[in-house]
Amino acid sequence: MDQPDIEHINAYLLALQETICAALTAADGGAVFHEDLWQRDEGGGGRTRVLRQGRVFEQAGVNFSRVYGGALPASATAHRPELAGRSYQAMGVSLVVHPENPYIPTSHANVRFFIAEKPGAEPIWWFGGGFDLTPFYGFHEDAVHWHRTAQALCQPFGDTVYPRYKRWCDDYFFLKHRNEARGIGGLFFDDLSAPNFNEAFAFCRAVSQGYLDAYLPIVERRKSHPWGERERQFQLYRRGRYVEFNLVWDRGTLFGLQSGGRTESVLMSMPPLARWQYHYDPAHDSPEAALYRDFLPARDWLKE
C-alpha cells in the first residue's frame, strides 16, 4: 500500500502521546500531566498535556494536534511552491522536556505527517520528525549513548540513514546568529515519503520509540547529581538559546503561529524560566566552557 492511511496515523499518534506521557510520569515520580483539549476555528484541534514542577522535570509538554486548512501558510510553501493552492492536513506529536537538575539535558522530539490535496491531482504527503538533546553540562557517555541509540534505530532502514539525518539535525538546530549549535543533535528528517508509505511510517515509529530508549537512561543516570546556584544560573542562560532558536529559526513554531494554531500549545516548548546576560564568557577551564569546547561543535560520537 502506497497511499497513506490517515486514520491509522492519527490513532498511532494518539497512542504515542499516551505512551510518552506515561513514561515521563514514571520517570518523574511526582507530578502528573494536565490535559487541555482544544479546537481550531479553521479546522481540527488537539490534545495538549503539560507536567509542571515535578520531582525531576520542571516542565514537560507533550502535544498532539491534527489541523486542516484550505490553503497553506507562507512558511510551508516557501520551500515547496508546488503546494500552493492545495488544501492540507497536518498531524503530529511534539514534546519538549525541561528538567530542573542542570545535569539532566533538555530533550525535544516530534513526529509529524502532512498531506496536501487538490481535485484531479495526486496527493502530496510526507513524514518528518526526529529528536535532539540539549545538555548544559556534557557527559561523554550520555552523548555516545544518545547517538548510538539513534544509529541503531536507523540501521534497519539502511547504512546511510543515520549519517544523513544526523548531519541534517546538526545543520537544523544551529543558531546562525550565534554561530553555535543548540545542543548535541540527534536525528532530523523531513519530506520523507520514500520508498513507500509503509516503510516511511515504520521509520517514524522507530524514531518515536528510539527517543524514549535514548533519553530515559540519561535522566536516570543524572537525576540525583548534586547541583547549586552556579549550575542553575548557567542552565537558565543556556535556556535563553532555546528560546532564541524556537522564535527565530524553528519552522514548526512558525508554521503553528502562521497557520492559526493554538498559541499556548505552539509555545509549550518554551522553558518556564530563562535568562540573558550580556557578553557572557565562561572561565577557560570551567565545566561551562567545556560545553562550548567539547560538546556543541558537531562531531562523530559513534567514533568515541
Swiss-Prot record:
SUPFAM superfamilies, alphabetized: Coproporphyrinogen III oxidase (SSF102886)
Catalysed reactions listed for this entry: coproporphyrinogen III + O2 + 2 H(+) = protoporphyrinogen IX + 2 CO2 + 2 H2O
Alphabetized NCBIfam families for the sequence: PRK05330.1 (NF003727)
Required cofactor(s): a divalent metal cation
Residue span of region Important for dimerization: 242-277
Keyword Cytoplasm in annotation: yes
Subunit structure: Homodimer.
Enzyme Commission identifier(s): 1.3.3.3
Organism, scientific name: Sodalis glossinidius (strain morsitans)
A single BP term in Gene Ontology: protoporphyrinogen IX biosynthetic process
Entry function: Involved in the heme biosynthesis. Catalyzes the aerobic oxidative decarboxylation of propionate groups of rings A and B of coproporphyrinogen-III to yield the vinyl groups in protoporphyrinogen-IX.
Alphabetically ordered keywords of this record: Cytoplasm, Heme biosynthesis, Metal-binding, Oxidoreductase, Porphyrin biosynthesis
Pathway: Porphyrin-containing compound metabolism; protoporphyrin-IX biosynthesis; protoporphyrinogen-IX from coproporphyrinogen-III (O2 route): step 1/1
Compartments, record wording: Cytoplasm
Annotated family: Belongs to the aerobic coproporphyrinogen-III oxidase family.
Binding site for a divalent metal cation: 98, 108, 147, 177
Protein name as annotated: Oxygen-dependent coproporphyrinogen-III oxidase
Upper classification of the organism: Bacteria, Pseudomonadati, Pseudomonadota, Gammaproteobacteria, Enterobacterales
Leader peptide range in chain numbering: none
GO cellular component: cytoplasm
Active-site residues, Swiss-Prot/TrEMBL: 108 (proton donor)
Main location: cytoplasm
Site residues (Important for dimerization), renumbered to this chain: 177
Catalytic EC class: oxidoreductase
Any one Pfam family match given in the protein's UniProt record, by short name: Coprogen_oxidas
Keyword Cytoplasm carried by entry: yes
Gene3D superfamilies reported for this sequence: Coproporphyrinogen III oxidase, aerobic (3.40.1500.10)
